[in-house]
Amino acid sequence: MSDRRLQLDVRVVGAGLLGTSIGLALSEKGVDVSLDDLSPTAVRLAVDYGAGRPATADDRPGLVIVAVPPDVTARTVAHELAAHPDALVTDVASVKAGILRELRVLGADVRRYLGTHPMAGRERGGPISARADLFLGRPWVIAGHDGISYSRAGAIEDLILDLGAVPVEMTVDEHDASVAMISHVPQLVSTIMAARLAAATDGAVGLAGQGVRDVTRIAGSDPGLWVQILAANADPVAAILKRVRDDVDSAIEALEHPDAPGSRRTIADLMGAGNAGVARIPGKHGSTRRYAQLVVMIDDTPGQLARLLTEIGELGVNMEDLRLEHSPGAQVGFAEVSVVPEAEAPLIAALTGRGWRIAGAS
C-alpha cells in the first residue's frame, strides 16, 4: 500500500476514461473506491481493470467524484449531494460556471460541492483507455466559489496530490475563460483544418508531414462530447473565435492583394505574433525556455529508435522532447530531438561520429 493523503472512502460516478483512471490511481494507493455508472458493462470493465468495486446501497463515502458527460453533470451532482448528505462532492467536467449556476437553480447544497477539472485526457475514451498515471504532473484546476470553506475542501487537494497532479486554484469564470483559450478553441481550429482534408486529393494527402499532423492531431475527438463542451462554454469560445476570424480575414486580404502596400508586413506581423504566443507555452517542468532541435534519420527497422535513445543517454545528454515522423512509402523515419541549445553542436558531432545521419548536417 502506498503512502497517501486522502483518508476517505471514495465513490466514483461514471466509469469512463477519467472516472476509471481516478479509480485505478486511488485503488493503487489503497483507497476504497466504489464505482457506479448507468452502464453495468462499463462498471464491470472498470472493476476488471482494478479501478475499484461495484457500488452498493450500504456505501457511506466521504468523497464523491462525478465523472459523467457535461450535459448531465449538474443533475448528477445534485443527486449525489442529496443521496450522500455527509459527503463532499466534486466533478471533473471541463466547464464549471454553468454547472454551479444550474446547481443553485436546482437548490442543491453547494456548501458541500467544489468543481474541479484535471487537464488530462486521451483521444480515446472509455474504461479500456484508462491509466493510473493519466494525471501525473498535469494541472488540476480547483474552481472555488463563495459557498464552500477551504477546510471542508481540503480533501479535494489531497485527492489531486495523491493522483500526482498539480492543484491550480481559479474561480469558475477564470477557469472557463482559460480552457476556452487553451483547449476549446484549439479543438475547433484543429477540427476545421482537418475538415478541409476530406476534400483534398489523394496526392495532397500523400504529402502530409509533421505540420499538418500536429495541427490536426486532436481532430479525431468525440463529436458528441465536444458538442456538449462547446455549448456549455459558448460565450468565451465565441469571443476568442471572433478574434481568430479577424486575424484570418487580415491574412486573406493580404494574400488576395500580395503586392499592395503593407500586405507582406501583415503576414509577417501575424507570424511574429504566433512566435511570441508559442514562446509563452510552458515546456518541461513548466519552463518557457526554448530548445534546439536536431532531426536524426532512422532506418525503419526494429530497435533503431531504442538504439538512438540509448546512445543519447550514453553521451550524457538530457533529451527534453522527442517527435517522430514517417514519410509514406519511405524506409526511413525522422526523430526530432529537442535539447538545450548548448548541447546541440556536441550532440550532432557525437552522433555523426557514431554513424547517425543528421538532416541538414554536412
Predicted regions and their residues:
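Internal alpha-helical scaffold of NAD(P)-dependent oxidoreductase catalytic cores
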Residues: L134-G220
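N-terminal Rossmann-like NAD(P) cofactor-binding module of classical short-chain dehydrogenase/reductase
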Residues: V64-I65, T90
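A conserved regulatory-domain signal marking ACT and ACT-like small-molecule sensing domains
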Residues: G277-S362
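Phosphate-coordination loops involved in phosphoryl transfer and adenosine-cofactor binding
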Residues: L6-D9, P61, D86, G137
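NAD(P)+-binding Rossmann beta1-loop-alpha1 motif at the extreme N-terminus of oxidoreductases
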Residues: M1-A55, L63
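Short beta->alpha hinge that forms the Motif I/post-I loop of the SAM-binding pocket
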Residues: L38, V68, V92-S94
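Rossmann-like NAD(P)(H) cofactor-binding subdomain of soluble oxidoreductases
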Residues: T76-P127
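Interdomain hinge/lid region at the active-site interface
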Residues: G203-G274
